[in-house]
């Protein structure tokens, strides 16, 4: 279950995880981005998401298919969705100019990834999937939090529910 919010303090994740019917909860930072690519007059729309600070399994995790994970201490390293990278001829080592929250940044692709969330992806407002027209990138949590003014906060919670959960009750409690 995804629960977008404008901004919430990170400590609320523990409160969400303790709700009846919730088996796990994580917070992340999500933001819209514009990706400038050579040869294109207009930037491509995209979505930037935080990676957790921890190693190992996490909710809605990414599968690294090429390269390596971004170094959490290096704010200009990103993972790129493999289908977008393939459609645009991008690979680890390439650089992207990305506008995030009104600021242009030069980012280095260090890996390509897949995610269950983005098996079939359409840009907001679109009906048909086009891998070349919507990019997804992942960054270390501190880097993306700084880019979107979300230090110490999250703007989307991800929850998994146990078998006994009543969806309507969980939704009411999350609200």
Kindly give the residue locations of the regions a language model identified.
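Membrane transport/envelope proteins' first extracytoplasmic loop
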Residues: 1-175
